Structures are given as structure tokens and as C-alpha cells.
Amino acid sequence: MALRVTADVWLARPWQCLHRTRALGTTATLAPKTLQPFEAIPQYSRNKWLKMIQILREQGQENLHLEMHQVFRELGPIFRHSVGKTQIVSVMLPEDAEKLHQVESMLPRRMHLEPWVAHRELRGLRRGVFLLNGPEWRLNRLRLNRNVLSPKAVQKFVPMVDMVARDFLETLKEKVLQNARGSLTMDVQQSLFNYTIEASNFALFGERLGLLGHDLSPGSLKFIHALHSMFKSTSQLLFLPKSLTRWTSTRVWKEHFDAWDVISEYANRCIWKVHQELRLGSSQTYSGIVAELISQGSLPLDAIKANSMELTAGSVDTTAIPLVMTLFELARNPDVQKALRQESLAAEASIAANPQKAMSDLPLLRAALKETLRLYPVGGFLERILSSDLVLQNYHVPAGTLVLLYLYSMGRNPAVFPRPERYMPQRWLERKRSFQHLAFGFGVRQCLGRRLAEVEMMLLLHHILKTFQVETLRQEDVQMAYRFVLMPSSSPVLTFRPVS
């Protein structure tokens, strides 16, 4: 059985403990039949001062996904609330995601991620596409798409990712052979975290970091610590106004800026090295995304650096966590794992000859990743600032309103996904599911690193499944915590046993 939340959730209003929160059912309030004004949208009101105290005390908002899930159960598929002067409308149905996409302009707007923006402003650095809006965003994005998202770009970096995935497999084999029991039981999360850094760095900068071995360099350890620290501090600062946290969270702000400084210095060094190699003409073959961007000269170096920082930071947890949760669910669902192994073994010859075949010859594995991201959406929610008026659930929503689309609640709605508590990859192969797989966003602002993440996950899972049986003694659900990304509050322990 997949996720069935059993954690106690403390809501800001009312302050009550909710036991055994269930998936959102079909008992939600139906949308009105005639068009209603914005003010008629069900309102979620909470005491903002009590909420601030709660966030300060808990150093974040780890149960955000559960809190919002319960509000949908109480108020229906749409509700509104305000944060300061900002009006926010929250939705969770695929039909509303489709409407958001239909009215999307050429310049879709997102809200600012204040902790990240504050670092760029303080250090005088440019912003990448994750932090930009308007014409500058579009200019950067169109030039990046060609080298990061396009099929031609994917074809170029797939062999690099496959090399790292195969090295991970060999390292895992070595550890298993060293164990007298002929198997290996471990918390795999940090190893997968290192894999995603290694693979992303190789695809971006054409450089291996050596993170799959036993002895990591001090520089590598510093970089890994900076990535962890950046995400942790982001979640601690995200839900409170800067005017407050500058006094209450000075240590956290320092940790946040220090972490970004390490990431910035790392990106600087990598880009300088790539630039020097290009000037010397030492590389005549494809050597990564950044080398292509510099060679084309369509973006200035500081813009390449800004986007490299964001791709580096954004391609780690968002890939490692789905890998962890997929392996855990396959360990709990051995029949699904067996079917995936048969698929991988049948496709091994074609994938060995051309690693890109993994993206087309493993449909059940692709479905398994969709099922993992249905249950454990790393981002938790998508957001758009409306550029024009829109009708959602027969309520008028004016232009300029911030709309949040909660993927966690969509994935647990039995009206959308029958038996949502079950891990059933086959559901994605039975029929087309429009606007139901949104873990990477939608439209022209979908995740820039989507294809890189998919390649990293597909290739590694293929190599693991054809070689190892993955097992776990744990049958209960893993509790998730919102720490800027949705991640396991404690990582599951898995056993890797060679396939006989």
C-alpha cells in the first residue's frame, strides 16, 4: 500500500489535532452552477500572528501539504486566503490546471522566491529563469530550451548521464560483494543525492566530481553541505516576511547567504574552466550544456552563471527524492518490481547500444515514475499570477491573483485517481490523463531541467532493476515533510540483493 497519512497535523484554525487524514474524497463542496463573484469563494481564515509564532517555533512549515489537504476536505476544491495584501486562490483539480494553461500568456508570472532573490540582490548577481519574470525571462528561456530541453540536446547529454549511472551500479556491486551476506542494507538517500549531483554536474559542465567513491574531497563535501544548507534555510525563511526574519532569524539568513556563496563560487570555477578549455580548443566533442551555451554566445557569461547556479541547485533533491521513493515503493510492491525488471531485461540490448532508448523502450518504468510523483510531488504545488481574469469552479478570479495548484491533494483525490492509496503504475498506461501528471509543471514555464531529471531517473532505475532485487522490512508509509521540497521525514532503509 502506498502513502496513507497518519501524522498528527496542527492547524492554525481551528487549533485541533487531526488523526488519520484521508485522501480527499468526492464529498467536497460542488462548484456553484452560476457564475459567482470572487468574494463568494470559500475563505480559509487563520490568525496570522498565531501562524507566524508556529512557523518560528517549528523553524518552517513541515506539514503545509497536510494542512492544505485538510482545508480542501473542509471547504471543497477551491478556497481563498490572504497573506498580507496578497490574495491567494488554491485549487487542486486537473480541470483547473487546464484552465490556467489555456489563459497563460507568453510571459507567465511566478511569485518571487524572496530568500533567493535577496542573495542575488545583496551580491549584485543576475537572476536565472527560475527567479525572472517578463521579457528577460522569455529571452533567457528560449535560448536555454535549445540546449537543455530540446530532443537534440537530450540526445547529446544522455551518454554522459548513462556513464554516471553505470558507475553508480558498479560501486553498488562492489559494496554488495564486500558484504559477507551477499546483500547490502543501507539508507540510500545520500548515495542517490551524490549520484544526482555527479550526473547533473557532468551534463552541465563536463566535469566529474568523484562523488560515487568512498573518500570525498573537502571541496566536494563543502559543496554538498552548501546544497543541504541552502534548501534547509530556504524553508525556514520562506513563509515569514523579511522585515521580521531579519531580526528573528539572523543566523538562518547568514547560513542561507553563505550556502549560496559556496554554490556561486563553484559555478564560477566550473564556467571559468569550461571557458578556458574552449579558448584553447582542447575539446572538439560535446562537453556539456554550459560549453554549448558559451560557444553559441547567445547569452552573456553572467546569465549563463545565473542559470547554471539554479540548474545545479534545482536538479539534486528534486531528482534524488523521487528515486528514493520509487525504490521504496517497488520494495513494498514486489509484483510491480518484477514486471519492471522483466521490461528492463527485455530492453537491455537496445539500451546498451543506445542509452536514449531507455526513454522510449521502458513505458512501465516511465509510468512508475509518474505514479511516484503522484504520491510524492517534490514541489508540492505550482503557482501562477493571473495575467487575465479567469473562471475557476464557476467563481470569477481577477487578473493579478496568485493561484496555487496543490499537486499533493490532486494525487490523493479518488475522483481523479481511483484507489489513490495504491501504488499502481499501470493506471498511467490504461488511458490518457490530461493535466494529471504535473510534477514538472506545464506550459512554457515547465521545469527547465525536466529532461535531465527524467534521464537521470530512468537510466539509474533501469540499471538497478536489471541487476538487483530491492527489498524492505518496512511496510508502513513514509511520512513526508515540506522543507521547500517535499521529502521523507526519515529515509527508508533498503536492501539490495543480486538478481539470481
Curated annotation (Swiss-Prot):
It comes from the Eukaryota. It is found in: Mitochondrion inner membrane. A cytochrome P450 monooxygenase that catalyzes the biosynthesis of aldosterone, the main mineralocorticoid in the human body responsible for salt and water homeostasis, thus involved in blood pressure regulation, arterial hypertension, and the development of heart failure. 21-hydroxyprogesterone binds at residue 381. Belongs to the cytochrome P450 family. Its EC number is 1.14.15.5, 1.14.15.4. Heme binds at residue 447. Pathway: Steroid biosynthesis. Its cofactor is heme. It catalyses: a steroid + 2 reduced [adrenodoxin] + O2 + 2 H(+) = an 11beta-hydroxysteroid + 2 oxidized [adrenodoxin] + H2O; 21-hydroxyprogesterone + 2 reduced [adrenodoxin] + O2 + 2 H(+) = corticosterone + 2 oxidized [adrenodoxin] + H2O; corticosterone + 2 reduced [adrenodoxin] + O2 + 2 H(+) = 18-hydroxycorticosterone + 2 oxidized [adrenodoxin] + H2O; 18-hydroxycorticosterone + 2 reduced [adrenodoxin] + O2 + 2 H(+) = aldosterone + 2 oxidized [adrenodoxin] + 2 H2O. GO terms for cellular component: mitochondrial inner membrane; mitochondrion. Keywords: Heme, Iron, Membrane, Metal-binding, Mitochondrion, Mitochondrion inner membrane, Monooxygenase, Oxidoreductase, Steroidogenesis, Transit peptide. This is Cytochrome P450 11B2, mitochondrial. One of its GO terms (molecular function) is corticosterone 18-monooxygenase activity. PANTHER family: CYTOCHROME P450, CYTOCHROME P450 11B2, MITOCHONDRIAL. InterPro entries: CYP11_CYP27_families, Cyt_P450, Cyt_P450_CS, Cyt_P450_mitochondrial, Cyt_P450_sf. Signal peptide: none annotated. Residues 1-24 form a transit peptide. It is a peripheral membrane protein. Disulfide bonds: none annotated. GO terms for biological process: aldosterone biosynthetic process; drinking behavior; monoatomic ion homeostasis; regulation of blood volume by renal aldosterone; regulation of systemic arterial blood pressure by circulatory renin-angiotensin.
